[in-house]
Swiss-Prot record:
This is Protease HtpX homolog. PANTHER family: PROTEASE HTPX (PTHR43221:SF1). It comes from Streptococcus uberis (strain ATCC BAA-854 / 0140J). Belongs to the peptidase M48B family. The chain crosses the membrane at residues 14-34, 39-59, 153-173, 196-216. Its EC number is 3.4.24.-.
Length: 297
C-alpha cells in the first residue's frame, strides 16, 4: 500500500506538470493571436519566459531562503539530537548530509530547501525541537529529507515559476489589448465563425489561465506533501511516529514572524494558519487528510 501511494502521488504530479505546460502554451498562443496574429510567436515567447523564470528561481541561493526565514546554521555541538537525526535520515535516504538550521520560533514547523541533494538544507523551529520526541522528530525530518530526495523543491519552484510566467503573459496581453495594442487587428480580423471561436478562446485564456495556473501550482504542492509523508514512513518504518507528529503540528500556533507565499509552501505545516475558502487554494492538504492516508497504509 505504501509503495502504491508513492507511485500514485508521482503520477499525479507528472499529470499536473503537463497541465502547466498546456496552460503555458495556451496563454502564449492566445496572446500571440490577439496581439500579433501569430500563435507560433506567442507560444515561443511563453516557453522562453517560463524557462527563464524557472532557471532563475531554481538556482536561488539556499542562504537567501534561510535568511528570509530567519534561520541560523548550527553545528552538531549546538543541537546534537537534531543534527544526528538529520544525519541518520540522510544516510537512510542515501543523499549527502544537508546543512542544518534552526529558526528561533515557538511554533512547530520545519522545511527543506535546495535545488538538488548536493546543496540542500533542513531547518526546524526551536518549538518543534522542544515539543517533539525522537520518533516524532524522525517523522518530521524524514518528511523533509524526502522532499530533498524526491527533488520536490525543484518541482515546486518550477511550478511557481510557470504560474508566474502565465500570470505575467496574461497581464501583458490584457494591458496591450486594453491600451490599443490589438484593437485595430481585432476590428479587421476575419468575422467568420472560426475566427470568432478563436477570438473567444483567446480572450478566455487570458482571463482564466492565471487562476487555473495558480490552482495547479497549489495542487502540485499538496501532492508533494502527501508524497513526502509516505516517503517519510518508508524511511523510518514508523507510521505512528509521523501520525503523532502531524497531530502535534495541527495544534501549533502560527509562526511569530511573517512568511512570504513562496516560503510558506516549503514548510511541513501552513506557517500562518490562514483560513482558505477552499482546499483548492491551499498550499497544504488538511492535516486530518494526511493522517487518514497514513492510517490506511
Amino acid at each position: 500500500m505504501l509503495y502504491q501511494q508513492i507511485a500514485q502521488n508521482k503520477r499525479k504530479t507528472i499529470f499536473l506538470i503537463l497541465a502547466f505546460f498546456f496552460l503555458l502554451t495556451a496563454i502564449g498562443a492566445a496572446a500571440g493571436y490577439l496581439l500579433v496574429e501569430s500563435y507560433q510567436f506567442g507560444i515561443v515567447l511563453a516557453l522562453i519566459l517560463g524557462s527563464i523564470y524557472a532557471f532563475s528561481m531554481i538556482f536561488q541561493s539556499t542562504n537567501v531562503v534561510m535568511g528570509m526565514n530567519k534561520a541560523r546554521e548550527i553545528t552538531v555541538d549546538q543541537a546534537p539530537d537534531f543534527f544526528h537525526i538529520v544525519e541518520d535520515m540522510a544516510m537512510v535516504a542515501q543523499i549527502p548530509m544537508p546543512k542544518v538550521y534552526i529558526i528561533d520560533d515557538p511554533s512547530l514547523n520545519a522545511f527543506a530547501t535546495g535545488s538538488s541533494p548536493e546543496n540542500a538544507a533542513v531547518a526546524a523551529t526551536s518549538g518543534l525541537l522542544q515539543v517533539m520526541n525522537r520518533e516524532e522528530l524522525e517523522g518530521v525530518i524524514g518528511h523533509e529529507i524526502s522532499h530533498i530526495r524526491n527533488y520536490d523543491i525543484r518541482i515546486s519552484t518550477i511550478a511557481v515559476a510557470l504560474a508566474s510566467a502565465i500570470t505575467l503573459i496574461a497581464s501583458m496581453g490584457s494591458r496591450m489589448m486594453w491600451y490599443g495594442g490589438g484593437r485595430q487587428r481585432q476590428n479587421d480580423r476575419d468575422n467568420s465563425s472560426l475566427g470568432i471561436v478563436f477570438l473567444i478562446f483567446s480572450l478566455l485564456s487570458l482571463i482564466l489561465a492565471p487562476l487555473i495556473a495558480s490552482m495547479v501550482q497549489l495542487a502540485i504542492s499538496r501532492q508533494r506533501e502527501y508524497l513526502a509523508d509516505a516517503s517519510s514512513v518508508e524511511l523510518t518504518r514508523n507510521p505512528e511516529g509521523m501520525i503523532r507528529a502531524l497531530e502535534k503540528l495541527s495544534q501549533s500556533q502560527p509562526m511569530s514572524h511573517p512568511v512570504d507565499d513562496a516560503s510558506s509552501a516549503l514548510y511541513i505545516n501552513e506557517p500562518q494558519k490562514r483560513e482558505s475558502l477552499s482546499s483548492l487554494f491551499s498550499t497544504h492538504p488538511p492535516i486530518a487528510d494526511r493522517i487518514e492516508r497514513l492510517r490506511h497504509m
